[in-house]
Each structure stands twice: as structure tokens, then as C-alpha cells.
Design a protein with these regions (language model features):
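Short runs within selected transmembrane alpha-helices of multi-pass transporters and secretion channels
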Residues: 45-48, 119-138, 144-156, 172-188
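Helix-terminus/linker motif at the lipid-water interface of multi-pass membrane proteins
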Residues: 6-35, 39, 57-58, 95-105, ...
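Hydrophobic alpha-helical segments typical of transmembrane helices
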Residues: 2, 14-15, 26, 51, ...
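Short alpha-helical transmembrane segments in multi-pass integral membrane proteins
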Residues: 55-122, 163-202
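Small-residue-rich hydrophobic transmembrane alpha-helices
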Residues: 29-87, 91-93, 126-140, 144-148
Length: 202
């Protein structure tokens, strides 16, 4: 988890560097939107803690079917929460910004709206990433989550630094969804391959 947080921080630094180059309105809009965005991160982290303990206990007890059932239930709960947060943030994005900024300008609203409108619909990817990565880690596979972290880092930096000249602030908005997608492409097949092997061993 410590390494994952370090990778996340490095990616956030790259995103912040690009935002800083776009002016004060972009910085203010991004900062306010990021605070709202952190709600989703906190909720998904809570789900990660729950599924981590559940999978680890059942993996140790050799209860493969309970792992499968628990992961499915966790996915349902996590994605339900993410859908609700997405809808809430999209409907209340301007009042949310006003909670953190007094009298924000139309330009600040433009940046915060753009960030939340692009990123919020992809919270489901963050949910998939949280559940599958934690489940894999809890089954004593550290390699795949490590590789997923590196994919996240590379894609987040590539999106912000590589596409900033072409897309500007939009590059920052798509960076996290791209990183989540890249990590999911690795982790989801990995989880099901592991479950097949565990079932076969049983």
C-alpha cells in the first residue's frame, strides 16, 4: 500500500505541474474539483480494507467459493456507491466548488466542471481497480499489483506531460481514467486466472 500511495503521489505531482502552467484559474478549479474527487477515493479505500480482510481470511482457510462470492458482492456495493457519487457530483458540482472557494469566477467553474464531468463517469474503473487489486494482493500475489502501479504511473505521466501540449487541461482530466483503465486491463484477467488455478487445486 505504501508503494501504491507513492506512485499515486508522483502521478499527482506530474498533473499538478501541468495545471500550474495553465494559470491561476486552472489551479483553483483543479484544486476545488480534486477535493470533491477525493470523496470517491476515500469510499473506494474503505471498500479495499473490507475486501482485503475478507479475501485474506478465506484464502487462508481454503474457501475459494467464498472468495468468489465476496468479490462479487464487493463489486456490486462498490460500483453502486461509485454510481451514486458520480450522479451526486455531476448534479452538485458547482455548489461543491463553492464550498471550497468564495465567489469563484466563470473561468474557475469552467475548469472544475471540465475535470469533474470527465472524471466522475469513470469512477467505476476506480472501483474495479480497488476490488481486483486488493483481492489479488490478499491472495499473496504482489507482482501483478506492483506492475499495475507502474502502469498507472506511466499512463498518468504520459497523459499529462505527453498530451498537455495538444489537449491542455483536458489532458489532466483524462490522466486518472487512463491510468485506472490500464491497471484494470492487467488486473482483471489476472484475478480470474488465479481463481481458475485455485479452483483446480481444490
Amino acid at each position: 500500500m505504501g508503494f501504491q500511495m507513492s506512485v499515486m503521489c508522483i502521478g499527482q505531482l506530474a498533473m499538478q505541474a501541468v495545471v500550474n502552467s495553465l494559470g491561476t484559474a486552472a489551479v483553483a478549479g483543479y484544486t476545488a474539483a480534486s477535493k470533491a474527487d477525493q470523496v470517491s477515493v476515500l469510499v473506494n479505500n474503505a471498500m479495499m480494507t473490507a475486501i482485503s480482510n475478507y479475501v485474506a481470511q478465506n484464502f487462508g482457510a481454503g474457501k475459494r467459493e467464498r472468495i468468489r462470492q465476496g468479490v462479487r458482492a464487493s463489486l456490486l456495493q462498490t460500483e453502486t456507491a461509485n454510481i451514486m457519487m458520480c450522479i451526486g457530483i455531476l448534479l452538485l458540482r458547482n455548489p461543491i466548488v463553492q464550498m471550497f472557494l468564495s465567489n469563484p469566477s466563470s473561468e474557475i467553474y469552467h475548469y472544475s466542471d471540465l475535470f469533474l464531468t470527465i472524471e466522475a463517469p469513470f469512477y467505476f474503473l476506480l472501483g474495479l481497480l480497488a476490488v481486483y487489486r486488493t483481492s489479488i494482493q490478499s491472495m499473496q500475489n504482489g507482482r501483478a499489483p506492483f506492475m499495475a502501479c507502474m502502469i498507472e504511473l506511466v499512463m498518468r505521466i504520459a497523459a499529462t506531460v505527453g498530451l498537455a501540449r495538444i489537449l491542455g487541461f483536458t489532458a489532466v482530466c483524462i490522466a486518472s481514467p487512463m491510468a485506472w483503465f490500464g491497471a484494470c486491463v492487467l488486473l482483471i484477467p489476472c484475478y480470474y486466472q488465479m481463481m481458475k488455478k485455485l479452483t483446480f487445486a481444490e
